[in-house]
């Protein structure tokens, strides 16, 4: 390995819940270090990785690809549409095959919650598993890039007031973030349609209408309305959702001077956020995308350090 500062070693990367606060902070600081000194990365041997995405993705998929290229990894192409999955091959057998072929890392996005548990429990699968999102379960790499973005802005988490707003029930981003942010000392609030709020969130924070939050918070974390995961529960027109729960131009005026706006993207413009605000001064949405590459470099380094 060319660099000396990255010492964190992880067998797999499937959920931030499984990492200690120290390990999470190590990943955050390494991400920022890579961003500030991108020449200080790489390995002195070849590693092989494949990105196996069974759900649509732009940012996660392409930023993992970019991270892999920057690290000098050998990427093996995988397309679910042209693979034996269409012949009925299970995810387990697909990854068993990839492991047998000698892949060091499998980055996977799959619609099944906790799909990775069977894979990491298998004595015959030797590839490191990196979770690129499991249905409406977890999205740990997105959560890490969000943490990096917040830490870059404020330099701490303890005492920060963070509102997570929108499609809470269906959001793997929300689940990953509420858990780790509370653990790191942030004060969490929730808002959005009550139909998409569950009592399971009560242990992490308090639900309040968005108009009671905008002038009180440090971070406004908006969530995409996930139409593809809805079963008809809580149907809103774009206009009504935006006016009731979205970041309108009027609500934007009430944000603190130091507050920032975040969104995991893709953004439904004029639904979760007014289109003109996506690149506003307080918005960090584009920065999140950029930070995704550095966060995923840190993740890949950590799992390859255990090889």
Curated annotation (Swiss-Prot):
Q: Which GO terms describe its cellular component?
A: cytosol
Q: Which PANTHER family match?
A: ASPARTATE CARBAMOYLTRANSFERASE, ORNITHINE CARBAMOYLTRANSFERASE, MITOCHONDRIAL
Assigned keywords, A-Z:
Pyrimidine biosynthesis, Transferase
The root-end lineage is: Bacteria, Bacillati, Bacillota, Bacilli, Lactobacillales
Known EC number(s)? 2.1.3.2
Subunit comment for this entry? Heterododecamer (2C3:3R2) of six catalytic PyrB chains organized as two trimers (C3), and six regulatory PyrI chains organized as three dimers (R2).
Note the SS bond partners.
none
Query: Under which name does UniProt file this protein?
Result: Aspartate carbamoyltransferase catalytic subunit
Q: In which pathway does it act?
A: Pyrimidine metabolism; UMP biosynthesis via de novo pathway; (S)-dihydroorotate from bicarbonate: step 2/3
What the protein does comes down to: Catalyzes the condensation of carbamoyl phosphate and aspartate to form carbamoyl aspartate and inorganic phosphate, the committed step in the de novo pyrimidine nucleotide biosynthesis pathway.
User: Gene behind this chain?
Assistant: pyrB
- GO molecular function term, any single one: aspartate carbamoyltransferase activity
HAMAP family recorded for this chain?
Asp_carb_tr
Q: Where does carbamoyl phosphate bind?
A: 59-60, 109, 139, 142, 265-266
Q: Which Gene3D superfamilies match?
A: Aspartate/ornithine carbamoyltransferase
């Amino acid at each position: 390995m060319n660099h000396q500062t990255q010492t964190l070693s992880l067998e797999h990367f499937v959920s931030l819940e499984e990492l200690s606060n120290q390990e999470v902070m190590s990943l955050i600081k390494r991400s920022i270090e890579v961003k500030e000194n991108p020449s200080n990365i790489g390995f002195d041997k070849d590693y092989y990785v494949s990105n196996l995405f069974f759900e649509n993705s732009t940012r996660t998929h392409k930023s993992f690809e970019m991270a892999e290229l920057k690290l000098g990894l050998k990427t093996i192409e995988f397309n679910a549409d042209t693979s034996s999955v269409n012949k009925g091959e299970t995810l387990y057998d697909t990854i068993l095959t990839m492991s047998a072929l000698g892949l060091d890392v499998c980055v996977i996005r799959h619609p099944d919650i906790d799909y990775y548990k069977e894979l990491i429990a298998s004595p015959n699968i030797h590839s490191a598993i990196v979770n690129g999102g499991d249905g409406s379960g977890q999205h740990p790499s997105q959560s890490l890039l969000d943490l990096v973005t917040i830490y870059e802005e404020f330099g701490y988490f303890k005492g920060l007031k963070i509102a997570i707003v929108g499609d809470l029930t269906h959001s793997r981003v929300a689940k990953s973030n509420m858990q780790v942010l509370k653990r790191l000392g942030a004060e969490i609030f929730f808002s959005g349609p009550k139909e998409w709020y569950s009592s399971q969130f009560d242990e992490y924070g308090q639900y309040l209408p968005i108009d009671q939050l905008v002038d009180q918070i440090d971070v406004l974390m908006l969530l995409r309305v996930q139409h593809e995961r809805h079963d008809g529960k809580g149907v809103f027109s774009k206009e009504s959702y935006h006016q009731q729960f979205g970041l309108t131009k009027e609500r934007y005026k009430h944000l603190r001077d130091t507050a920032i706006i975040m969104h995991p993207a893709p953004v439904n413009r004029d639904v979760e956020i007014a289109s003109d605000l996506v690149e506003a001064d307080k918005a960090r949405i584009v920065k999140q995308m950029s930070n995704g590459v550095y966060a995923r470099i840190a993740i890949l380094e950590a799992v390859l350090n255990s090889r």
